[in-house]
Amino acid sequence: MREAPPFDKALGMYYYVTDTCPSGGVIKKSPEDFVVEEVLADGTVVAVGGVELRPRVGGWTWIHVVKRNVDTIRLMIRLAKALGVSPREVSVGGIKDTRAVASHIISVRGAVKGLPEIPGVKFLGMWSMDRPMSPSEIYGNRFTIVLRDVERVDCAVEALEALKSAAVPNYYGYQRFGTIRPVSHLLGRALLRKSPEEFFDAMFCKIFEHESAAAKKARELACRGEYQKALETFPRRFVEERAFLRRLAQGYDMWNAIMGIPLQILRIYVEAAQSYLFNRFLSARLELGPLDKPLEGDLVEVGGQVAYYAEGLGGDVVLPVAGAGVRMPRGKVGEALLKVMKEEGVDPAAFLKMPRGLKAYGSYRRARLEVGDFSYAVRGRDVELRFVLPRGSYATVLLREAVKPAEPYRHGF
């Protein structure tokens, strides 16, 4: 095990499980370097080259989509508009990477006779189905990733060999928080703490190197209290900042100004805070021992049920995603997790005391990353990796073990 750099620690990822030297290298140098193919619950791969599905009589249409450098949510909205249906009638099994080539299924309620032309998008097939696409319909994703311009190929190979047998922590990856401006979890934590001043500081007074000049200037103005000037300076794509500033400029108190931000965005912040807390829990659990060896007091998943570990019970170690309705581990594991909550200043009851629409319920997540069909090939200074991950797990968590980036943004993360 090796200590992670400050950037990772700020996201709750305190460790690498591999004790190898940093390989360096760049991911996503082009979208074709990061290929994501959805794997359905029955094991069928929705391959870039096409897939055959068995149609069923019903009220939905499943569409095979291959997108390149296209945001999933924006694609769904555009498709809904083109087909004349509500965005609520368009669904996916999971959000795919934008800076990638991604092959997956989108479902639309009703029959679809023709599909629009959308730049960066190919439609390869359509099937009538008796149900919509949803997270329960997919197992996960198959990844084919090329790591370019590797500085130390020997370090990459050593790390990848170690990963074949290592119990890799199932952290929430960089993209959950952002690499240019990693503050979503800080905004969520401020909401949980009911601290509007902390929220304001995270949104406007934390300014990062790789932000655009316009964004930096606007944040500086906002941080100084020049709300109207900041509102005029922020480009229109900064929806949440502009919504917050608009109310501040109108004289709202800070908490009610925050509530002017669209609810779905505020919910993303709370979920990011839950993800950050999970990462910290996982780091604390790593300090107590390997993730594939349950300890007394651990929670384990056995046959789809979560129970406290007992000798001979077996199962996979799980940790709580903090929120209402979850159990905490017992013993020294539970003590370590409660210590994290105290350090972060988050009351376990805070998740239920949120305003309507923001109440956060907890869940359980496997501590160990479940990696399938793992292989790699070295081609000069490039390394190609192939593997399958269950939905909700992040490919970048595996890649960081080899690259070990001090500044993830510079490596394409």
UniProtKB/Swiss-Prot annotation:
Keyword Isomerase on entry: yes
Alphabetic keyword roster: Isomerase, tRNA processing
Residues of the TRUD domain: 167-370
Catalytic function, reaction form: uridine(13) in tRNA = pseudouridine(13) in tRNA
One Gene Ontology MF term: tRNA pseudouridine(13) synthase activity
Pfam families: TruD
Active site residues according to the UniProt entry: 97 (nucleophile)
PROSITE patterns for the chain: TRUD
Major enzyme class: isomerase
Entry keyword annotation includes Isomerase: yes
EC number: 5.4.99.27
UniProt cross-references to InterPro entries, sorted A to Z: PsdUridine_synth_cat_dom_sf, PsdUridine_synth_TruD, PsdUridine_synth_TruD_insert, TruD_catalytic
One GO-annotated biological process of the protein: tRNA pseudouridine synthesis
HAMAP family found in the cross-reference section: TruD
Function: Could be responsible for synthesis of pseudouridine from uracil-13 in transfer RNAs.
UniProt record similarity statement: Belongs to the pseudouridine synthase TruD family.
Identification of the protein by name: Probable tRNA pseudouridine synthase D
